[in-house]
């Protein structure tokens, strides 16, 4: 595998003449192939011939005539370690770029690379070749990955991130799976909170028949937000229908007679007798609903 040091050593050994910066980059490409184990079998005019790839010649040739065409370069290589399969490389100067195309004998598609010449060639014409190049490491790396490795059939490495089994198999958790304790719940302060019987008060979240813009009468005996006379929080061992002064259970699908119940305390507590909560006389026309509408007389009514 070529690197910038071996490529520069090949350039110094060949001592090629450069007419411009495109020449410098084109010869650096040639030196990268030689440093990767390829031998040059044709360059210049013979490399542009139609039979350049099909020629049986495997002889190593010199670099004479490699830049005889202005802005066009061609090289034919063979690699003895890879069955002497031939490779044709052509470079075309276009403005400040050098377009590189390479194809192997019998290959289906060519490898392609666009190189910005100014990123790798200096304007210096000094005898020291190292002063005429810059960023040679990147140029050699790009040639290796985009041209040479593809011609050799090496797959391009793809960065991937290994995911743990918990990332790939674990389903998202939308609900709290903390178990609900059946016994008394002890607060860190030491206060014991007894569990409340019933379903926890969910019936008023799911309206039944007659649901509309006005709320219906709350649940009765189902632990809803609106506490009724048969609420299990007051009578956990029955429906409350046998308590004195309480009406019987409602008919299926129908609320009990009268308005909806407002919350009141358990029986026997002074000031919370059920008889104190009676149905108000009908309101006259034009009166607002006390729970759902603004007070009559304007928004500043007190």
UniProtKB/Swiss-Prot annotation:
GO CC annotation: cytosol; endoplasmic reticulum; nucleus; plasma membrane; proteasome complex
Gene3D superfamilies for the chain: 3.40.1000.30
Region of interest (Disordered), residue spans: 151-188, 259-302
InterPro entries per record: PI31-like, PI31_Prot_N
Pfam entry (one): PI31_Prot_N
Residues bearing the modification N-acetylalanine: 2
One GO BP: proteasome-mediated ubiquitin-dependent protein catabolic process
Keywords, sorted A to Z: Acetylation, Proteasome
Superkingdom, natural source: Eukaryota
Biased composition (Pro residues): 259-269
Family, as annotated: Belongs to the proteasome inhibitor PI31 family.
Function comment: Could play an important role in control of proteasome function. Inhibits the hydrolysis of protein and peptide substrates by the 20S proteasome.
Protein name in UniProt: Probable proteasome inhibitor
């Amino acid at each position: 595998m070529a690197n910038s040091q071996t490529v520069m050593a090949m350039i110094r050994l060949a001592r090629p003449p450069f007419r411009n910066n495109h020449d410098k980059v084109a010869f650096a490409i040639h030196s990268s192939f030689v440093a990767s184990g390829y031998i040059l079998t044709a360059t210049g005019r013979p490399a542009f011939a139609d039979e350049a790839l099909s020629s049986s010649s495997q002889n190593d040739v010199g670099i004479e005539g490699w830049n005889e065409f202005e802005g066009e370069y061609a090289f034919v290589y063979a690699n003895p370690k890879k069955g002497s399969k031939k490779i044709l490389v052509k470079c075309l100067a276009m403005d400040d770029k050098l377009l590189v195309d390479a194809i192997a004998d019998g290959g289906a598609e060519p490898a392609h690379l666009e190189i910005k010449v100014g990123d790798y060639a200096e304007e210096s014409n000094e005898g020291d070749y190292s002063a005429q190049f810059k960023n040679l490491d990147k140029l050699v790396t790009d040639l290796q990955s985009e041209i040479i490795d593809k011609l050799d059939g090496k797959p391009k490495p793809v960065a991937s991130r290994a995911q743990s089994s918990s990332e790939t198999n674990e389903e998202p958790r939308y609900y709290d799976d903390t178990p609900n304790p059946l016994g008394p719940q002890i607060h860190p302060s030491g206060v014991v909170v007894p569990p409340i019987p019933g379903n926890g008060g969910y019936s008023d979240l799911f309206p039944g028949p007659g649901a509309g813009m006005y709320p219906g009468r709350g649940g009765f005996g189902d632990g809803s937000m609106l506490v009724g006379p048969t609420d299990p929080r007051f009578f956990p061992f029955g429906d409350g229908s046998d308590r004195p002064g309480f009406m019987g259970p409602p008919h299926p699908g129908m609320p009990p007679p009268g308005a909806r119940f407002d919350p009141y305390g358990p029986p026997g507590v002074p000031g919370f007798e059920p008889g104190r909560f009676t149905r108000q006389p009908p309101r006259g026309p034009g009166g607002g609903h006390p729970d759902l509408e603004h007070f009559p007389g304007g928004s500043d009514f007190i």
